[in-house]
Amino acid sequence: MERARRKTMKSLLILLTIAALLAIIALAAIHAYVKNAYRNRIITPDQAMELNPDCILILGARVWDTGPGPMLADRLLQGIELYKAGVSDRLLVSGDHGTKEYDEVNAMKNYAIEHGVPSEHIFMDHAGFSTYDSMYRARDVFQVKKVIIVTKEFHLYRSLYIANKLGLDAYGVASDLRPYARQEYVEIREVLARIKDFFKVAIQPEPTYLGDPIPIDGNGDATND
C-alpha cells in the first residue's frame, strides 16, 4: 500500500513539474512575441518626419511636487523635439489624473507650454491609467488613426503591440536620454506587464473610462480642467 502511494505521489510530482515547465515556456513565448511583434516600428526622429501622424502621444510617468520626474521629463523633451521638428502639430499627453492630489497630465502640459508648445496644440488624456487605456482612448476618444508614441524603449515594445493590435497605425520613438534610478526593477515589472497585456488585448475590454469624442484635430484646450 505504501509503495503504491509513493508511486502515485512520484507520478503526480512529475506531472506537476512538466506542467510548470510548459507554463514557463508558454509565458516566455508570449513575452518574446509581445516584445518582438512590432519592434521594427521603433524609429528614429528623422524617420518620424516622413510619417505625417495625427499626433505625438507622450505616455505619463511619475511626477514630483516640482514637476515631471526625470523619466517623464525626457519623454516630454523627446516629444517636444518631434513637435518642433514638424512631425505633427498635436501633442497628446496621457497619464494618471485619478485624484486631485496626483496629476500627471497637467504637469505634462505645463512643461510642454514652458518649452514653447501652444496650449491649444496639447491635448490631455486625464484617464490614461494604463498603457492599454491610453491606446484605447487615443483611438476612441481622441479619434487618432496614426500616431507616434514616445516613451522609454523597453516600454515601446508593449505600447506598440497594444496600439497596433487595437487598430492604430502606430510607430514609436524612444526617449532614453540618460540612466534612471531603479531601472532594473522597472524592466522586471515590464516583463510581467507584457504578459498581462497580451491577454488583455486578446479580450479587449473597455478602458476604465471612455467619454465623448474629442477629435485630435480640434483645440487641445477642450481638455483643460
Residue ranges and their predicted role:
Residues 3-46:
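N-terminal type II signal-anchor transmembrane helix
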Residues 7-9, 79, 162, 193, ...:
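General helical structural elements
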Residues 23-33, 57, 196-203:
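Residue-level signal for alpha-helical transmembrane segments in multi-pass membrane proteins
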Residues 29-188:
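A structural signal for short, hydrophobic/glycine-enriched beta-strand patches
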Residues 99-104, 171, 193-200, 217-222:
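A general structural signal for short secondary-structure boundary/capping elements
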Residues 187-209:
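A transmembrane-helix-recognition feature enriched in membrane-embedded lipid enzymes
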Residues 205-225:
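Short linear elements at protein peripheries
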